[in-house]
A protein has these predicted regions:
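Well-ordered secondary-structure scaffolds
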Residues: 2-161
Length: 161
């Protein structure tokens, strides 16, 4: 054991070096806290968030961080393809209410950080323009809009009681 897992400066620099290298001008971070999070202690998660924001600002990137709870699952599915499918549902104006709420919260922060006024991401989800914009982004990167997400051969529904 190297005892680096809880070293906030190392965690922050690892995450932020990748984000800054992408060349973005603004960045919104969703730092999770709670029983399902990497940083379960809210105070430590806050410290990580503040450290990453400062690193971003020092590099000339408009950076903000939200510390959000991860004590309960977000959305209705688990697994990469299922979670991507759920995210696409949100872009199409549907999806689970908690995912929609977090999406709008993060998008509003990004719009504000970018200095854009008069735009509400909730409207973009409702009128389909969020999905249209996402499709243009996929096409601009040479992605396949018709790519199929993998489907598991087995399915198990687990209902909370």
């Amino acid at each position: 054991m190297t005892a680096t897992v809880e070293a906030i400066p190392l965690i922050a620099s690892s995450i932020m070096s990748k984000k800054i290298a992408e060349g973005t001008s603004a960045l919104i971070l969703d730092v999770k806290t709670g029983s399902g999070a990497f940083m379960s202690d809210p105070a430590k998660a806050g410290e990580l968030a503040r450290t990453m924001v400062q690193l971003g600002l020092d590099a000339g990137v408009k950076t903000r961080a939200l510390v959000t709870a991860m004590d309960v699952p977000l959305g209705l599915t688990a697994g990469n393809a299922l979670e991507v499918r759920e995210s696409i549902e949100v872009l199409a104006g549907g999806g689970p209410a908690d995912v929609v709420e977090l999406t709008i919260l993060l998008a509003r922060e990004m719009i504000d950080a970018a200095g854009i006024t008069g735009k509400d991401p909730a409207d973009a989800l409702k009128d389909g323009s969020a999905m249209d914009h996402w499709k243009r982004m996929i096409a601009a990167q040479g992605g396949d809009l018709d790519a199929k997400l993998p489907v598991a051969q087995e399915k198990h529904v687990i209902t909370a009681t």
